[in-house]
Design a protein with these regions (language model features):
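Helical element adjacent to the flavin cofactor pocket in flavoenzyme catalytic cores
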Residues: 1-56
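Glycine-rich phosphate/pyrophosphate-binding beta-alpha loops
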Residues: 5, 105, 123-126, 179-185
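Conserved FAD/dinucleotide-binding core of flavoprotein oxidoreductases
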Residues: 111-147
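Short, conserved active-site loop motifs that form the nucleotide-linked donor/cofactor pocket
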Residues: 25-27, 115, 179
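Flavin (primarily FAD) cofactor-binding/catalytic cores of flavoenzymes
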Residues: 11-20, 31-34, 49, 88-109, ...
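C-terminal catalytic lobe of FAD-dependent flavoproteins
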Residues: 10, 102-103, 143-185
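General beta-strand recognition
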Residues: 44-46, 116, 180-181
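Central helical "cap/lid" subdomain
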Residues: 47-96, 148
Length: 185
């Protein structure tokens, strides 16, 4: 594909967006929501050591969104689609665009600090431990495609929020006009 684009440092982009949010007056609070109290005018979030009232809230907590929605009486058939990532060390540019290996269900992409292999889909909920067999398969298959890959620098597993129809939940709560949902993959 000519003219394709990708980023070599997705974290740097996320950090720039976050910094702009703060610069424009956004407030970042990193606490667990313990409960929500709702009435006709507002919603109060009860967190670990804070209470804050809002006119409206947007619930966009990814795979954890259902835990908050349940506090409001809304229930969704949300599950977790787990994807696995391996970062390989390399001192040279091995590929110049994302490369898919459809047989094994993963992509390879050159990023600023190595080559990332990521993919596969596993429906396994929020709390199950990572499946090391999937990481081993991705590493083995990646080395078949790019034998010059270096050592494994890091591995991690991500949790994508998924619904049976693969469509996201976007819109107002049917039970509370003060709540907007925005999650799903």
């Amino acid at each position: 594909f000519t003219g394709s684009r990708h980023t070599t440092n997705p974290l740097a982009i996320s950090n720039k967006i976050f910094d702009k949010f703060i610069e424009l007056g956004g407030i970042y609070i990193n606490q667990h929501v313990k409960n929500l109290i709702q009435n006709e005018k507002n919603i109060e979030l009860l967190m670990e050591d804070k209470k804050i009232k809002f006119d409206k809230i947007i619930i966009c907590a990814g795979a954890w969104s259902n835990q908050i929605a349940n506090m409001l009486g809304d229930k969704f058939p949300l599950d977790t689609e787990r994807g696995y990532h391996i970062l390989f060390e390399t001192n040279e540019k091995l590929i110049n665009r994302p490369v898919a290996w459809s047989e094994s269900g993963f992509y390879l992409i050159q990023i600023h600090n190595g080559v990332r292999a990521a993919g596969t889909v596993e429906i396994a909920g929020l709390n199950k431990s990572p499946n090391k067999k999937r990481l081993n398969m991705i590493e083995r298959q990646s080395r078949k495609v790019l034998p010059q890959l270096g050592k494994v620098q890091s591995t991690w597993m991500g949790r994508r929020p998924t619904l049976p129809d693969s469509l996201p939940i976007i819109g107002k709560s049917q039970k509370n006009n003060n709540v907007i949902y925005a999650f799903g993959h």
